From Swiss-Prot:
SUPFAM superfamilies: L35p-like. One of its GO terms (molecular function) is structural constituent of ribosome. PROSITE patterns: RIBOSOMAL_L35. One of its GO terms (cellular component) is cytosolic large ribosomal subunit. The gene is rpmI. Belongs to the bacterial ribosomal protein bL35 family. GO terms for biological process: translation. InterPro entries: Ribosomal_bL35, Ribosomal_bL35-like, Ribosomal_bL35_CS, Ribosomal_bL35_sf. Keywords: Ribonucleoprotein, Ribosomal protein. Signal peptide: none annotated. This is Large ribosomal subunit protein bL35.
C-alpha cells in the first residue's frame, strides 16, 4: 500500500487569517506595526480593525490553509 503524505496548512498564515461562517477570509491591515507617529491620524484610524481578503488572492490563500 502506498502511503500518501497529508498536506499541511501554512502555519504562518493560520495565525494571520480568520475564516467567517460564510467562508470569507479576514486579515489585518499592513503598515501599522511601527512608525505610527509619522502617519496621519486618519491613516492610523483607517488601518485599525480587519478587512476581507481580495478575490484575486482568495484561491491562492485557500490552498495554503487546506485544513481549516
Amino acid at each position: 500500500m502506498i502511503k500518501v503524505i497529508k498536506k499541511k496548512s501554512h502555519s504562518g498564515l493560520k495565525k494571520r487569517i480568520k475564516i467567517t461562517k460564510k467562508k470569507k477570509l479576514l486579515r489585518g491591515h499592513a503598515y501599522k506595526n511601527h512608525l505610527a507617529a509619522s502617519k496621519t491620524t486618519k491613516q492610523n484610524r483607517q488601518l485599525r480593525g480587519v478587512t476581507c481578503v481580495k478575490l484575486c488572492d482568495y484561491n491562492r490563500i485557500k490552498t495554503l490553509i487546506r485544513g481549516l
